[in-house]
């Protein structure tokens, strides 16, 4: 039980981890991480604006933009169906939101000039460059797969913790707490490392060398969004099937 308690404490305390300086707003006596909110709002505005443009005037013969958005939707459906199974339909919006938010957030770190915006403390960066964002996304995924299992199986969902033998109960419980930890640290670590490498190379050789690294970073950022969305869908499918 000590291991489970430590895991719970880790999930609670991890949001206090800080890398570098941060800019906070004081709202109702609470410190709100302003950097993450500002950049997250920009990403959400980009996604909402793109969605409005995509559905504003659909054509019978699709335009290039409409074809692109239909391809993205089909791609998300394929990922969801592959990992969840035939009952994937209700989960497409969730998986799609996760994938698109992470994808645009990751790319914003490389393509948007966040650094030119001056703050009293710290600097703006991709939302996924902050551990608070990645932990929040991972916890949302945890809530989603618990909900998926309970909505399909009711209280019988908890029988999975004593399968194939009750001896594995502590390990099976601990596994549910390590999933969000691994999701959050994988995404946070990769995006932070990518931005740090680019910053260091730009400071050392500001002309040519960082360009290939930036393209590699864009590729890795896309892969990280796909990995997160795929694992989220896999966890949801696993909870609905009731096996590991």
Curated annotation (Swiss-Prot):
The keyword Iron does not apply. Its main location: plastid. It is found in: Plastid, Chloroplast thylakoid membrane. Keywords: ATP synthesis, CF(0), Chloroplast, Hydrogen ion transport, Ion transport, Membrane, Plastid, Thylakoid, Transmembrane, Transmembrane helix, Transport. It holds the Pfam family ATP-synt_A. The keyword Transmembrane applies. It is a multi-pass membrane protein. Coiled coil: none annotated. F-type ATPases have 2 components, CF(1) - the catalytic core - and CF(0) - the membrane proton channel. CF(1) has five subunits: alpha(3), beta(3), gamma(1), delta(1), epsilon(1). CF(0) has four main subunits: a, b, b' and c. This is ATP synthase subunit a, chloroplastic. It comes from Gossypium barbadense (Sea Island cotton). The gene is atpI.
